[in-house]
C-alpha cells in the first residue's frame, strides 16, 4: 500500500463553485457529446461523437448556442472533422483527439489500470463529410490510457485496433468483470437504424482480456435472441444497449444483472449460464429505443445487498411509443425477486434520462424528453428540470425537484460526475449528423415516416415540425444541493494511492469529525442514457482513535462489490462530500 499526501486536487476551485442546485454554462464541447468518460488521474473528460461535420470548436456562442463560424478540423492533412475531444473542465480548454474509426454509438469500460476500452461503432457514411481517411468502427477497439497528462504538449490519444472484436457491433454494452477483463454484449451488425431486426441482430458476447491474451470465442446469449416474427415486438427487438450490472456475491462470481427489452435475468458470464431467471419488468421494454434510466443503488456496508432501480423510458406502443413515468426496483439476490413499483417520476413520463450517482448517496436524473422515445427525431418536449432521487427516504418521499436548465438535452446527450462532486452536462443532437437548425425534414413529404435498415420504420417521428433541436455544443455544470456547503466540505490530505481487497487503510481528512462516510465511485461510460458500469460503494469506516483527522477504512471484500480499477474516493461528513481523489483497487 502506497501512501500519498494530497496536494493537487483542490486548487482553490471551491471558491468558484455556484450556489446549490443550479446549472451554469461553462464552455463548448468541441464535438457533439454523444459519449463521455472521465480518464483517471486527470482534470478532463473525453467527448466522442459519430463522424460528421463539426462547428463546435472555438467561437461557439455560450449564451445563444450559435455554432462557431469555423469548421473544427484535424490539424493534419486528412481533411477530417474533429469527432473526439479532451475537455479540461477547470479551464474549459479543448484538445483534439483522433479515434480514427467511426465511434457512432460505441460502448466503453475501464481496464484495471484505468485505461478506457472504447469498443465498436458504425460503418462509414460518406454523404455527410469526407471519410477517405476514416475506418469502419464496428469491430474496433480503441484504448485511451489514464493520466496524468498535461494539456500543453500532451500527446495522449487513442490506440486503435480496427479488427479486434470478433463480430460487428453497433449499440453494444460493456462493463468490467471481476478479473478486470472487459465484457462486450450484444448490438447490431448494421448501423443507421433505430430498431433492431433479427437479420442483423448480434445476440452474442465476448471478452477483451486485461492481460492482453487471446480471448475465447464469442458466445451466444439467449436473452438477446428473437426471430423475424418478432421484429415489431418491442419487448424483444428493443434490445440494443442492454442494461448490465455486476451483482455482489460472496462467491466472487461474474453474476451480472442483464435487462434486454422487458426480459431480465442474472447471468454468469464467467461460466456461460443463467444463474437466476427474473420476472419481466412491467410496462414494456426499457432498453434502446425504450431507453430507461437504470442504476445499481448505492451499495452499503453489511453485505452489500444490491437493488436495481429502473425509471421511465418508453413503451412498446407502435408506431408512437409513449414516455413512461413509472419506476421499479428489484433485489436480484432475493430468493424470489420481484419488481416493486417505486415512486413515479414527478414531472410525468420521461425517456432518455441520465441517472448520475452522487457521493452523498442520492441519484440525480436529468436530460431526455417527456414525449416519444430515443432515436433520431423520435422525441418531443425536452425535460429541463433535474430530479434528485434519495433511496434512503421512505416510499412516497424519494423524489425532489431540483434546478432547471435552459438548454434542451434530447437524443445524444450525456451527464457525468466530476471529482468536484458536480455533474458535467453536454450534448444533444436528434439529427444524428450535423444540423444547425434541428428540424424534421418535410421536403420529401414522408414525415412522420423514416428509414430503418433499408426500408420504412414501423415507428414514427414524434418531433413536431415546428420544433428545433439543433446540434448542441454548450457544456453545463450542474451543482447539487450539497454544494451550497462547499466552504465547509472535508478536505482529503493523505490517502493510499492503491489498496487490495479486504485491506485496512487510513485516510486523513480535515473537517471530518462526525457522521463520516467514505465511498468509492465509478462514473462509468455514459451514452444514450445508459451509464455502463457506474456504481457507488460505501466502505466500512470509523474515525480513528489516532486522532489527527484520521479515518480507519476497510476496502471491499471482493471484486463483485467493485471490480479492479481506479476510482474516485470520497469522504462525506453530514452529507457534504469532499472533492474526490483517485485510488486504485487491485487484485
Predicted regions and their residues:
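Beta-strand/beta-sandwich contexts
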Residues: 25-33, 483-516, 581-587
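Blade-edge beta-strand/turn elements of extracellular beta-propeller
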Residues: 19-25, 90-100, 144-166, 185, ...
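Immunoglobulin-like IPT/TIG beta-sandwich domains and homologous Ig-like subdomains
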Residues: 47-60, 82-88, 503-582
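Blade-level signature of beta-propeller repeat domains, shared across WD40, Kelch, NHL, RCC1
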Residues: 409-489, 568-572, 577, 581
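Beta-propeller and closely related beta-sheet repeat lectin domains
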Residues: 32-37, 49, 73, 82, ...
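Beta-propeller domains
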Residues: 19-25, 37-99, 119-150, 226-373
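Beta-propeller blade signature
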Residues: 79-90, 131-152, 197-213, 263-268, ...
Amino acid at each position: 500500500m502506497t501512501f500519498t499526501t494530497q496536494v493537487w486536487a483542490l486548487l482553490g476551485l471551491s471558491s468558484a463553485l455556484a450556489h446549490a442546485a443550479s446549472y451554469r454554462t461553462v464552455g463548448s464541447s468541441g464535438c457533439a457529446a454523444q459519449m463521455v468518460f472521465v480518464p483517471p488521474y486527470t482534470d478532463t473528460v473525453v467527448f466522442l461523437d459519430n463522424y460528421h461535420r463539426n462547428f463546435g470548436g472555438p467561437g461557439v456562442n455560450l449564451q445563444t448556442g450559435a455554432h462557431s463560424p469555423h469548421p473544427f478540423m484535424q490539424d493534419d492533412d486528412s481533411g477530417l472533422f474533429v469527432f473526439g475531444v479532451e475537455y479540461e473542465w477547470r479551464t474549459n480548454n479543448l484538445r483534439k483527439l483522433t479515434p480514427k474509426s467511426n465511434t457512432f454509438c460505441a460502448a466503453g469500460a475501464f481496464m484495471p489500470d484505468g485505461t478506457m476500452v472504447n469498443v465498436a461503432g458504425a460503418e462509414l457514411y460518406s454523404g455527410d463529410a469526407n471519410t477517405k481517411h476514416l475506418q469502419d468502427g464496428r469491430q474496433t477497439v480503441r484504448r485511451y490510457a489514464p493520466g496524468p497528462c498535461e494539456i500543453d504538449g500532451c500527446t495522449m490519444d487513442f490506440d486503435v485496433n480496427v479488427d479486434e472484436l470478433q463480430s460487428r457491433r453497433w449499440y453494444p454494452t460493456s462493463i468490467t468483470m471481476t478479473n478486470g477483463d472487459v465484457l462486450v454484449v450484444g448490438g447490431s451488425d448494421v448501423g443507421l437504424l433505430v430498431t433492431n431486426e433479427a437479420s442483423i441482430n448480434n445476440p452474442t458476447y465476448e471478452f477483451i482480456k486485461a492481460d492482453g491474451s487471446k480471448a475465447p470465442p464469442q458466445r451466444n446469449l439467449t436473452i438477446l435472441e428473437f426471430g423475424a416474427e418478432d421484429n415489431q415486438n418491442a419487448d424483444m427487438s428493443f434490445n440494443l444497449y442492454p442494461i448490465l450490472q455486476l451483482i455482489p456475491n460472496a462467491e466472487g462470481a461474474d453474476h451480472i444483472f442483464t435487462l434486454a427489452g422487458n426480459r431480465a435475468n442474472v447471468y454468469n458470464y464467467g461460466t456461460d449460464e443463467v444463474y437466476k431467471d427474473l420476472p419481466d419488468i412491467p410496462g414494456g421494454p426499457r432498453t434502446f429505443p425504450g431507453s430507461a434510466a437504470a442504476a445499481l443503488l448505492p451499495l452499503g456496508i453489511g453485505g452489500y445487498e444490491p437493488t436495481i432501480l429502473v425509471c421511465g423510458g418508453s413503451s412498446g406502443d407502435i408506431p408512437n411509443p409513449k414516455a413512461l413515468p413509472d419506476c421499479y426496483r428489484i433485489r436480484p439476490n432475493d430468493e424470489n425477486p420481484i419488481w416493486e413499483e417505486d415512486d413515479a417520476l414527478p414531472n410525468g413520463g420521461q425517456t432518455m434520462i441520465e441517472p448520475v450517482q452522487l457521493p452523498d448517496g442520492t441519484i440525480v436524473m436529468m436530460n431526455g424528453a417527456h414525449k416519444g422515445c430515443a432515436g433520431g427525431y423520435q422525441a418531443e418536449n425536452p425535460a429541463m428540470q433535474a430530479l434528485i432521487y434519495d433511496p434512503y427516504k421512505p416510499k412516497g418521499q424519494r423524489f425532489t425537484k431540483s434546478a432547471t436548465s435552459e438548454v434542451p438535452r434530447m437524443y445524444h446527450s450525456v451527464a457525468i460526475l466530476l471529482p468536484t462532486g458536480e455533474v458535467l452536462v453536454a450534448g444533444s443532437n436528434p439529427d444524428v449528423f450535423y444540423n444547425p437548425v434541428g428540424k424534421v425534414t418535410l421536403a420529401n413529404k414522408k414525415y412522420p415516416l423514416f428509414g430503418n435498415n433499408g426500408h420504412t420504420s414501423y415507428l414514427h417521428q414524434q418531433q413536431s415540425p415546428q420544433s428545433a433541436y439543433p446540434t448542441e455544443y454548450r457544456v453545463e455544470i450542474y451543482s447539487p444541493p450539497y454544494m451550497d456547503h462547499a466552504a465547509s466540505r472535508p478536505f482529503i490530505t493523505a490517502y493510499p494511492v492503491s489498496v487490495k481487497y479486504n485491506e485496512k487503510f487510513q485516510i486523513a481528512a480535515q473537517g471530518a469529525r462526525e457522521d463520516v462516510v467514505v465511498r468509492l465511485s465509478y462514473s462509468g461510460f455514459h451514452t444514450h442514457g445508459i451509464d455502463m458500469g457506474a456504481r457507488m460503494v460505501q466502505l466500512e469506516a470509523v474515525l480513528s482513535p489516532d486522532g489527527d483527522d484520521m479515518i480507519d477504512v476497510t476496502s471491499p471484500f471482493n471484486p463483485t462489490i467493485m471490480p479492479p480499477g481506479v476510482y474516485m474516493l470520497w469522504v462525506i461528513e453530514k452529507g457534504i462530500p469532499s472533492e474526490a481523489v483517485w485510488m486504485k483497487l487491485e487484485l
